Amino acid sequence: MEKLLSTGKTKAIGVSNFSKAEMERLVQNTSVVPAVHQLEGHPWLQQRSFVDWHKSKGIHVTHYSPFGNQNEIYSSKVQIGKLIDEPVLAEIGKKYNKSSAQVALGKFSCRPIQAGNNVY
């Protein structure tokens, strides 16, 4: 990937689902810091300190799975329910005339956006 970047065939390098140890190793052992890291992120999995770490390194974070994992096949024997059924989200939604799904989406869409200075 670093070679592609130097040829101009790509504009940036991004990663997905790396742990902090993997990210630290990547930053220490490569010549290019990733521009973006895609992580699972929702009210049950906010990863605030990891997101702050990325910010300190100049790495933009994007999130996927804003409603948590809705697929029961991945869950253990313990039933944890669905994020969109979370009573706290429903209560906040009721206060603002929004669904719990809209509240969950709003949690991450209200974060500050890092703006780049290149226009592609």
Name what the model sees in each region:
Residues 1-120:
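Beta/alpha (TIM)-barrel catalytic core signal, keyed to glycine-rich beta->alpha loops juxtaposed to Asp/Glu
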